[in-house]
């Protein structure tokens, strides 16, 4: 076998490979010899089929398989012998002339091909003991608990039908049907039947609910309102509309009583238990947000201290995946780049930067895990998979089987487990400082930087 490197430019390497025809033929004969013990052919006893006869029947397909396996094994040998780390699958170029291919398959010519590979650059890891990471700290206050309990109570508020002839007031729940028009024409999504609206909740576009205060059951009003300039559907944003709206039911809110009886309606023993459950839920919610903040701060430090050229192919793949998601969201919400105060060119540049960062961080985390023996055990993956399957009651086995059949999907279960293990490893070495922040600041920061995680 001859291997000549024809290009070594940055992270790209190309090789010209030549493997003697005799070597390929010997491997193919080994396959055929192994095959004779497995196939059943009329007129021959098991294991007694002559190789020459097998070659007539299966010679071409066996040669194709032999060549494919030889190319794969040779490419891995090239990579391993040079201490390289692949960034993606090798790209093989075979001879273009049909006669050359036929000669190789017939065993009359050496197997010659070229292979291009892209590699991961050497990564020199930072001293994680020098890292200082700030952790925001938010304690669950009694006011937070009160607010959450009141929200739960509001969601479970009961209503009673108002007396005949009553007029709708703020706070009432009304049932309405409407047909919306713009410039006299019906528009998509502008009509609805029998929807519940609490007057004053601002669930509908600005100005809509106010015009129904004072309406009675059976009354139809023409509601004039404008869609906000930042409305999700850009085709409706900023436009004036009219809605022929009919009220079919008016219900008055009953008094909210947040007491032991209310807690029992929710399946709990008393109000104190409800408050404790809410406090624990808020604590878990805050902890997740604080964890995300710490991870982002850590990733920022890893980004700052590990500057290298990421493999272009990996960056392009990550960018295409991100961009596809962005475009799908924009199409769904009928938004344009102008709606986001940017241009497509600027957006592409920003998301390509994010893709480059994600790829570099992924490679750094992988290097840290490899050098420090950080792994994810099968039972950890299985527990995560069971948890995922339980999110779709009744389809647990279907979900489980899907992941077992799809290694790439299973890798998506493993990835966050591995990432969290590496993050915990670094945080054990780093210095963590705490800073008290408000709940609002914690979640505002979390939302602002979620795209780069």
From Swiss-Prot:
Compartmental location: Cytoplasm
Cross-referenced PROSITE patterns: FKBP_PPIASE
Location of the PPIase FKBP-type domain: 171-256
Superkingdom of origin organism: Bacteria
Keywords: Cell cycle, Cell division, Chaperone, Cytoplasm, Isomerase, Rotamase
EC number: 5.2.1.8
Catalytic activities: [protein]-peptidylproline (omega=180) = [protein]-peptidylproline (omega=0)
GO cellular component: cytoplasm
Stored InterPro entries: PPIase_dom_sf, PPIase_FKBP_dom, Trig_fac, Trigger_fac_C, Trigger_fac_C_sf, Trigger_fac_ribosome-bd_bac, Trigger_fac_ribosome-bd_sf, Trigger_fact/SurA_dom_sf
A biological process term (GO) from this entry: cell division
GO molecular function annotation: peptidyl-prolyl cis-trans isomerase activity; protein folding chaperone; ribosome binding
Enzyme type, top EC level: isomerase
Domain notes for this protein: Consists of 3 domains; the N-terminus binds the ribosome, the middle domain has PPIase activity, while the C-terminus has intrinsic chaperone activity on its own.
Function per UniProt: Involved in protein export. Acts as a chaperone by maintaining the newly synthesized protein in an open conformation. Functions as a peptidyl-prolyl cis-trans isomerase.
Similarity section: Belongs to the FKBP-type PPIase family. Tig subfamily.
HAMAP family tied to this protein: Trigger_factor_Tig (MF_00303)
Name of the molecule in the record: Trigger factor
Organism per entry: Nitrobacter winogradskyi (strain ATCC 25391 / DSM 10237 / CIP 104748 / NCIMB 11846 / Nb-255)
Gene that encodes it: tig
